[in-house]
């Protein structure tokens, strides 16, 4: 008798995607982040759903409803901090996942890569809107500053900003629509994840060597399911440690002050995972130029496949490219640090230098070094 998991219309889809899926035998722990992101998404949707049951999206009561969740709801504090710090874990996994793709040349699967970029934008939009909901000082001023950037768009900018606000400033209408979209977007993200996996399973996984692995495949279950479960345990332990020992480590103290349109915080800054892009935005004195640089800092990933000049797919055997890659990582850490600093000397010039380096490495140095490595291969 044939196994039901191979014949049942629904089970056979799950079977071919997770159980009998052929996977390269050489996948390292860098390939764990896809499944970890799935767990993060699940945790965020579940905790978010329970938080939404107690939250009120009204400017008069939003801040108090979050306080009520933390003080009066059974394990409400746990839900709130799991959700807030779960977002941080989500972005850590997301950036490591993208970094893995860049290092090992996974971007040559262009459909999977492009859906991934869409996912990155969708998750960033979700996180930004979620940050506005507690209606603290940084929520209000962060929303005001970031949405105001759209006013840099010629001709339609001002009308666009007022349309998004639902008035002439960030107010009740803005908060209500942000809550609606923050609730909706994770389900759109889930749908995009399925498309992402669909395209990935068309081509099969890349591997650390970048060499086709068709002759050497193993079934996903039990090998990679066990490996993934170990990853889950490590990540959930890290999340639990963060939530239970220092839940406010990654947050901003200003967000414990209720939103006040009359008092501007001394330093308006987004959550830590947006600081690199915020630093790039601030490094350009022109408003429209800054907005374009901000968008391009992420959108630049879309042209990475076009800039791939190397004869080898992966950076595993390309020491010069590896040096450049880790320089890029150092530049991103520098930008993240600068994004959290005030706009004054010497931070301004450091931020501008790091921003120029970021684009220079991706657009010019990486392809040039790849061509040099191709030339050295002939020797």
Curated annotation (Swiss-Prot):
Membrane topology: Multi-pass membrane protein
A GO CC term assigned to this protein in UniProt: respiratory chain complex III
GO annotation, biological process: mitochondrial electron transport, ubiquinol to cytochrome c
Molecular-function annotations in GO: metal ion binding; ubiquinol-cytochrome-c reductase activity
Bilayer-crossing regions: 33-53, 77-98, 113-133, 178-198, 226-246, 288-308, 320-340, 347-367
Localization (cell): Mitochondrion inner membrane
Residues that hold heme b b562 according to the record: 83, 182
Protein residues bound to a ubiquinone: 201
InterPro entries cross-referenced by the UniProt entry: Cyt_b/b6_C, Cyt_b/b6_C_sf, Cyt_b/b6_N, Cytb/b6-like_sf, Cytochrome_b, Cytochrome_b_C_euk/bac, Cytochrome_b_N_euk/bac, Di-haem_cyt_TM
Ligand binding (heme b b566): 97, 196
Cofactor: binding comment: Binds 2 heme b groups non-covalently.
A Pfam family annotated for this UniProt entry: Cytochrome_B
tRNA processing among keywords: no
PANTHER family reported in the protein's UniProt record: CYTOCHROME B
Function (record text): Component of the ubiquinol-cytochrome c reductase complex (complex III or cytochrome b-c1 complex) that is part of the mitochondrial respiratory chain. The b-c1 complex mediates electron transfer from ubiquinol to cytochrome c. Contributes to the generation of a proton gradient across the mitochondrial membrane that is then used for ATP synthesis.
SUBUNIT field: The cytochrome bc1 complex contains 11 subunits: 3 respiratory subunits (MT-CYB, CYC1 and UQCRFS1), 2 core proteins (UQCRC1 and UQCRC2) and 6 low-molecular weight proteins (UQCRH/QCR6, UQCRB/QCR7, UQCRQ/QCR8, UQCR10/QCR9, UQCR11/QCR10 and a cleavage product of UQCRFS1). This cytochrome bc1 complex then forms a dimer.
Name of the protein in question: Cytochrome b
Organism in which the protein naturally occurs: Artibeus intermedius (Intermediate fruit-eating bat)
Gene that this polypeptide is encoded by: MT-CYB
